[in-house]
Amino acid sequence: MPEYQNPHQEPGSERRLLLVFLLTFLVLIAFEPLLKKFSPPSPPPEKHAATEQTASTSASAPVPSARQPAVPPPPTVTKQASSEREIVVENSLYRITFSNRGAQVKSWILKKFDNDAQNGPLELVNSAAAQKYGYPLSLWTYDEAVRNRLSSALYVTSSEGTLSAPATVTFEYADQDLSVRKTFHFDHSYVLRVETSVAYKGSEISALPMWPSGFGDQATPASFAAGRIDYHDNDSTDKTALVFPNYVLRLAIKKVSGGDTLKGPFEWAGPVDQYFAAVFIPGDPEAASMVTLRNSLEVPRDPEKPESKETTKVEVLGAAVGNLHGPNDERMYVGPKELSVLEATPVPTIKNDHPDLRGLVDFGWWGLIAKPLFLWLRWTYFHIVPNWGWAIVVQTLIITLALLPLRISQMKSMLKMQRIAPQIKSIQEKYKKYSLRDPRKAAMNEEITALYKKEGANPAGGCLPMLIQFPFLIAYYRMLGIALDLRHAHWLWIRDLSAPDHILAIGMIVSMLLMQRITPQPAGMDPAQQKMMTWMMPLFMGFIFFNLAAGLNLYYAESNLISIVQQAIMNRTKLGREMREMAEKRARKKDK
């Protein structure tokens, strides 16, 4: 049976303590006879009066014990503040409010970003969750009683009032058996340095800095559900990580069970949401561990009616990261998932590749297309038109025009298929009497294939433009989902291109209906199938896009409108007129 090891103590500490007590006891026993042998003789008896005075004095004083140490131990040094007070540290990017109760953060405001309601600066500390489960930069220990003492103690601070970065603030606390020191260093970036050390009953214990309970930017149940814990270890056995060296492992809520300890190495780790992150950057990735935290919280069902009694249960995530076997010295990034900022934030790495935080921006499997699209969109915004909505319009126009040759190729392919449609039907009628298992049925496919080759027709040619456009659509979806720049970006009547806009979604549905009506249908298409493509497909796509980001609907609706103009022009060309005449002939034959 393995021996239980207290995680707060180093291995063997209990045995060493027992050995110290045993040696002390032996020294006291051996020292007592020596005191009797070498002590001076007793003084001769004095007069009665003097004896009475001496006896009186002796009665009032404590009688020394032979086993009492010659020098008493020094009194316990305590460091405790008399009252709670706040210390504010700020630079051009943030304003952090510390409380000396727990030496933890009560408010963390990002000055350059608005909250979701767009009525004030962004507050990252979720007050409801923090009051229940702990504030940022409090300390995690495996002993809940010690953890509660660490977060409720009144620390002595090295500074007071409001400080401007660069600055350093130290919090200290000591009582009979607990000694704590927390030091925070601030500069002009989103990164701060965190140093912590905790001793309990004379032994150093593990106490990890933590961000315990979600972000203040989370307001709706959906935003809470978007919370994750991201980490990068660069030494993972995950199959995907082996293929992609900079692959980031992401723990969604359903994969997190509170209190689990994950062993490192960790180059960085911490809770994130769609646009912001609070990740710890250990100074020694090899020695780092992470404790995952998950708790439940009751929030208003409708964030716009916080006074309502209707609530819903959500899950909040957090993480504690650091060294389990001693003091901690690490950095922490708390800020936006903005690619340029993350790439400028250095990280100690194990393999010296991608030594920054760029992995926090999750482009997903379509990153090969999504990231260049995003960088192109940013360039358009900064160099051509200083509005994100119009930048999307310009980019969509260029993409759609670039796909014009494919659309022309699609029309040519459809025309060729219409020309040979009677011959294909004749071949099919020829082999109609044979069953599918009859070997002669294969001859039908061979004849049709030979006909395609002779006429230069490609039955899949009509689908090519759609197949080419599909990756761009998915990449746009991924890009707009993580593009911090589009958060609260305005365009015409739209206040936030990253949020749904139902007017634009309806416009997208109408544009798809128009597109289906003016696009020539392939030869031989069943009328019921044609009707479904004309009506059901736009409605189905509208249902999907109705609650997606307005920026994505803008891209798709504009792409449809440009395609409508292209198709209207192409319908007037010789190729278009020929396709229309053939379609009219097919219609007249069906009427007969």
Where are these regions (language model features)?
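Soluble non-transmembrane domains of integral membrane proteins
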Residues: 86-355
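Aromatic/His-enriched, Gly/Pro-containing loop or helix-boundary segments
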Residues: 10-15, 52-54, 60, 79, ...
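Juxtamembrane extramembrane loops of integral membrane proteins
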Residues: 2-4, 33-128, 171, 586-592
